[in-house]
């Protein structure tokens, strides 16, 4: 599970069916940070050195990512300096679009866009948009508002921050984390990222989960170069991936494990590895179902927390645990990704084999 919070733009809306186990809110500056199949249960998304051997994770990290372009959340009505109501972007700009240019100037962030609007000499602007795989241009009449500002009536976002868990590190310093993608909370789209970083974090408090109300962990993240651990390069449905530059700072205890093939995984005893305070520990779970051909790749494992200590402290799986490694028979078999809303002792996981294939995709062998 991931806890996410937007850095700029309007606040995220709560989503109904599932929420990433990435601590559901990303934080800026110094901040704390199902499978819709036969079960029909609500779920929340919870973040190689030869022979598929990796260093096992379980450590929480702060995450900061910038969007590739400026993400459009919605359009809205605005009031002009004449007191009339206007909605200039309605039907022209859609939620989920990315603004990549204005009046032939490339823009990467919210600041670029507001600066261009502040210098506007005429009302008509041409926005260059990316909509899915298509690029298009739309003409919009900006509205002059009180104070001589021009506005387009568009809610936008250009970054996301939060807290999640590292799953593993390969022999060439590539990491896998979360086990699920980071989606925008307002539009539900998988966010296109232009880049990002991982940072040190410390867990400050735990909110215990209850039926119908998933718990969460809160951490302190200081986004500066002294606390930077590495680079985020990919945001996929199977997790986030990139490079760790400060390996010793993150992997204080370096434990090599082999990644299990899907066919090796079975129901029965297993453990998850996570940090609820100052140290990473293993907690007992049961694997109750294994589906190598799951419709959603990040829900191939169904698990139940059985460890009395973990149940007492968290109630089960909580937001912030996305990416927590799942171990069985001495091997890394997967990572926690989602929690059932109506039963926080149960959740989903992704196969570690799938994550390893994703982190290696596009790399030279």
Positions of PLM-derived features:
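PDZ-domain C-terminal substructure recognizer with occasional recognition of PDZ-binding tails
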Residues: 40-47, 61, 94, 114-154
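Short, flexible surface segments
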Residues: 68, 95-96, 266, 322, ...
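Conserved PDZ fold ligand-binding element
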Residues: 89-110, 326-329, 333-334, 338
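PDZ domains, with a preference for the canonical peptide-binding region formed by the helix
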Residues: 101-134, 343-345, 350-354
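Serine endopeptidase catalytic core focused on the charge-relay Asp
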Residues: 143-315, 319, 328-329, 337, ...
């Amino acid at each position: 599970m991931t806890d996410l919070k937007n850095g700029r733009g309007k606040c995220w809306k709560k989503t109904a069916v599932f929420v990433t186990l990435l601590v559901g809110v990303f934080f800026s500056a110094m901040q704390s940070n199902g499978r819709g199949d036969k079960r029909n249960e609500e779920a929340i998304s919870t973040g190689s050195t030869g022979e598929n051997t990796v260093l096992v994770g379980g450590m929480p990290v702060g995450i900061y990512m910038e969007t590739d372009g400026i993400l459009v959340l919605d359009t809205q009505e605005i009031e002009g300096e004449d007191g009339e109501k206007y909605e200039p972007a309605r039907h022209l700009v859609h939620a989920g679009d990315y603004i990549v240019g204005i009046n032939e100037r490339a823009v990467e962030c919210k600041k670029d866009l507001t600066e261009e609007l502040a210098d506007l000499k005429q009302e008509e602007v041409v926005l260059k948009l990316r909509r899915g795989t298509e690029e298009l241009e739309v003409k919009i009449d900006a509205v002059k508002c009180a104070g001589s500002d021009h506005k387009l009536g568009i809610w936008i976002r250009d970054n996301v921050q939060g807290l999640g868990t590292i799953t593993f590190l390969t022999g060439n310093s590539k990491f896998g984390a979360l086990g699920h993608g980071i989606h925008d909370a307002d539009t539900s789209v998988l966010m296109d990222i232009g880049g990002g970083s991982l940072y040190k974090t410390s867990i400050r408090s735990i909110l215990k989960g209850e039926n119908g109300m998933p718990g969460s962990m809160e951490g302190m993240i200081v986004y500066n170069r002294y606390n930077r651990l590495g680079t985020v390069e990919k945001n996929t449905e199977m997790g986030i991936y990139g490079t760790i530059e400060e390996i010793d700072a993150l992997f204080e205890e370096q434990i090599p494990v082999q990644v299990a093939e899907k066919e090796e995984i079975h129901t029965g005893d297993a453990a998850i590895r996570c940090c609820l305070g100052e140290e990473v520990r293993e907690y007992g779970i049961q694997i109750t179902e294994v589906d190598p051909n799951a419709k959603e790749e990040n829900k191939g494992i169904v698990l139940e927390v059985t460890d009395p200590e973990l149940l007492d402290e968290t109630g089960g799986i909580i937001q912030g645990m996305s990416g927590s490694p799942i171990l069985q028979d001495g091997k890394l078999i997967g990572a926690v990704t989602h929690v059932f809303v109506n039963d926080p002792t149960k959740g989903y996981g992704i196969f570690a084999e799938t994550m390893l294939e994703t982190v290696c995709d596009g790399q030279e062998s």
